[in-house]
């Protein structure tokens, strides 16, 4: 997050470390590793009702907190995440892969669209205690890809 902030990319003001620990314990946090080096980390959810609202129908895997090690940027780490998510979704009879990102970062939105994600809408997340602190009151772009 620090490096992204230094490069003028928007970053979270804070992060819910207890939530991260819970995701790890619940096997919802993943990493791509090569030779003991972490190349990329990401988390998944199977429900995201506060952000996806009426579209959240138990038919999707939601990708969150995708972070690529800066030393491995530009080496298709996201493609590895997406390929894994597509296989997982298909083998679990899920129809979509969904994610959200900063609404005002057209560069990252276009990047995800280049992989086939469709822009659904911009949305301001609620200030709900059920959301992790870093996900409250954000303007996000909602993206999804059909994997059927």
Where does each model-flagged region fall?
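C-terminal "cap" of GNAT-fold acetyltransferases
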Residues: 102-104, 115, 125-148
């Amino acid at each position: 997050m620090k490096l992204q902030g230094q490069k003028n990319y928007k970053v979270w003001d804070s992060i819910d470390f207890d939530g991260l620990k819970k995701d790890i314990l619940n096997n919802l946090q993943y990493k791509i590793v090569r030779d003991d080096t972490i190349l990329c980390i990401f988390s998944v959810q199977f429900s995201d009702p506060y952000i996806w609202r009426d579209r959240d129908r138990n038919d999707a895997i939601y990708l969150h907190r995708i972070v690529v090690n800066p030393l491995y940027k530009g080496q298709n780490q996201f493609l590895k995440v997406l390929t894994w998510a597509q296989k997982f979704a298909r083998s679990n009879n899920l129809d979509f892969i969904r994610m959200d990102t900063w609404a005002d970062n057209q560069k990252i939105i276009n990047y995800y669209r280049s992989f086939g994600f469709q822009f659904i809408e911009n949305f301001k997340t609620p200030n709900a205690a059920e959301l992790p602190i870093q996900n409250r009151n954000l303007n996000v772009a909602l993206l999804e890809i059909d994997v059927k």
